[in-house]
């Protein structure tokens, strides 16, 4: 059968000597969708890298305004395709047309493209730093090679390799992108890539500034992240796949930014339960079951202190899980993966109190599942009992006392988020102060009195955290300009003549509004003259 074309070197063309083919599947009906997609082989990968390197060289002469124009034009083209994008993504993922796809994720996607455009145009993101007395100047700039992006299955727009936050950050920082689609939603990615390519041509970017393939063999993925032409890579997905990519990139000395597994611990203290038992139970289930629990910020590990009110809370949560309708999982592997995780958890001492089996539905599904374990058992098996289940699954850990809860916090692995619910009258303050210092260093984002599922696209956001949530605790995958720094190199100019400097490092502020650090002070002012302090 005729396979869909790939986008390589500024051309939609057939894959050369593909290694195979595949079809997307409608997970709500377990039916194969008609379009066929190629599994790219060595020739495609070689051409991707060569064209990506050429595009990186050409992008050096493209102004920040042109990059911003592209991102804004692309956002507009996505909006013009709303109906087709929503219909296609719904078929491929079973995510709700409304509000999820049309009213939440698509506006988030176009919004972050526009925020990246604003950061590129304003230029403060590059952190221009000038020491006038010795004439040393530095700023962040592009990497000199393409950024390879591997998108996940759970966000067909907002984390898509060709439209998500990694894509927006890489382009805004001045890099071309090689996007590897997720095979769970190739049709959605094809539509997005067509819109991106149209915007490339409309705004005058190099033709290979955006390239896209649908799938490839694992060893070719390793080649992409480790090739000398590659600037950096970004991956969102499972820990096992992420670590294999990291190993390949590390051997070649190439940066790779990973978002992998996270169980997002939430500590719910006694005063909070006493004051808001039913309310918090409902919040927990709502957060855990959102999109069938297929969020990297799903609250999968809940810590409680032993007591009568706690047992009432456990009962309330159990009722929520038992009465909730199981959602549709994204792929055929989903139910089996949850079953495998439950085997690990129960073998380590956890007890299932709700669910625990595949749901009898038309699509891929698993019963909402709640487990419990004592704090003592958790401390005996902390590694196994922190295994992530990608679905509506939470483990309740009942600690004996605050000291044991603190000890539990100290053995947690790195997570994207961690939360603490406490009462509003100060009853839980002592316990909070015991736990918070331990939790703070284990998570990227610390929350109080709210569940972790939502991730706002704002400059102050950190969607990152210590290993194994990510590969480095110092970077965020969400928010501009912070997420752009992953895809930038620090360029220093020592005693370089003015006519050879980039505009951001000249005495004259190139925009009048750009923030620069001049002689140790952040300012928007220009430098009056060479060798003098700024005005």
Regions inferred by a protein language model and the residue ranges of each:
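N-terminal Rossmann-like NAD(P)+-binding subdomain of aldehyde/semialdehyde dehydrogenases
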Residues: 1-135, 169, 529-534
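Conserved small-residue-rich beta-alpha loop and adjacent elements
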Residues: 18, 125-203, 392
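A structured beta-alpha segment of the ubiquitous adenosine-cofactor-binding alpha/beta core
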Residues: 136-138, 211-234
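Hydrophobic/aromatic ligand-binding patch that stacks against planar heteroaromatic rings
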Residues: 168-171, 224, 248, 408, ...
């Amino acid at each position: 059968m005729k396979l869909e074309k790939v986008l390589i070197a500024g051309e939609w063309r057939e894959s050369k000597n593909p290694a195979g083919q595949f079809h997307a599947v409608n997970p709500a009906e377990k039916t194969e969708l008609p379009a066929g997609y190629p599994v790219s082989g060595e020739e495609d990968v070689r051409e991707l890298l060569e064209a990506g390197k050429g595009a990186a060289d050409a992008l050096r002469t493209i102004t920040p305004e042109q990059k911003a124009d592209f991102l804004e034009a692309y956002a507009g083209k996505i909006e013009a395709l709303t109906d087709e994008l929503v219909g296609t993504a719904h078929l491929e993922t079973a995510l709700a047309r409304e509000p999820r796809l049309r009213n939440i994720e698509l506006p988030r996607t176009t919004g972050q493209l526009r925020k990246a455009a604003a950061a590129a145009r304003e230029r403060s993101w590059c952190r221009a730093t000038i020491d006038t007395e010795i004439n040393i100047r530095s700023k962040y700039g592009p990497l000199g090679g393409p950024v390879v992006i591997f998108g996940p299955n759970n966000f067909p727009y907002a984390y898509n390799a060709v439209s998500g936050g990694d894509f927006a950050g890489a382009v805004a920082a001045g890099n071309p992108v090689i996007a590897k689609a997720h095979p769970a939603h190739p049709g959605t990615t094809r539509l997005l890539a067509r819109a991106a390519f149209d915007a490339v041509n409309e705004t005058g970017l190099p033709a290979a500034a955006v390239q896209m393939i649908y799938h490839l063999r694992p060893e070719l993925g390793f080649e992409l992240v480790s090739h000398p032409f590659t600037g950096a890579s970004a991956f969102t997905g499972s820990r096992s796949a992420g670590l294999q990519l990291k190993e390949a990139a590390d051997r070649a000395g190439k940066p790779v930014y990973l978002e992998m597994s996270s169980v997002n611990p939430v500590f719910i203290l006694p005063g909070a339960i006493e004051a808001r038992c039913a309310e918090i139970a409902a919040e927990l289930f709502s957060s855990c079951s959102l999109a069938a629990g297929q969020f990297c910020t799903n609250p999968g590990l809940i810590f409680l202190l032993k007591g009568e009110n706690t047992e009432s809370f456990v009962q309330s949560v159990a009722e929520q899980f038992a009465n909730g309708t199981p959602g549709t999982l994204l792929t055929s592997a989903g139910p089996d993966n949850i079953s495998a995780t439950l085997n690990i958890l129960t073998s380590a001492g956890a007890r299932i109190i709700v669910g625990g089996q595949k749901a009898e539905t038309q699509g891929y599904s698993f019963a909402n599942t709640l487990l419990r374990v004592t704090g003592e058992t958790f401390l005996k098996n902390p590694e196994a009992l922190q295994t992530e289940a990608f679905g509506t699954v939470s483990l309740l850990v009942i600690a004996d006392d605050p000291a044991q809860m603190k000890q539990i916090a100290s053995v947690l692995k790195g997570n994207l988020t961690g939360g603490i619910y406490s009462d509003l009258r100060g009853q839980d303050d002592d316990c909070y102060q015991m736990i918070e210092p331990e939790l703070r260093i284990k998570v990227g984002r610390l929350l109080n009195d709210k569940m972790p599922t939502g991730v706002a696209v704002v400059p102050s956001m950190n969607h990152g955290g210590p290993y194994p949530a990510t590969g480095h605790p110092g970077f965020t995958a969400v928010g501009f300009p912070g997420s752009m720094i992953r895809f930038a190199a620090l360029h220093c100019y020592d005693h370089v003549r003015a006519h050879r400097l980039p505009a951001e490092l000249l005495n004259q502020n190139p925009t009048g509004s750009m923030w620069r650090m001049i002689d140790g002070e952040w300012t928007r002012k220009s430098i009056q003259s060479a060798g003098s302090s700024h005005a």
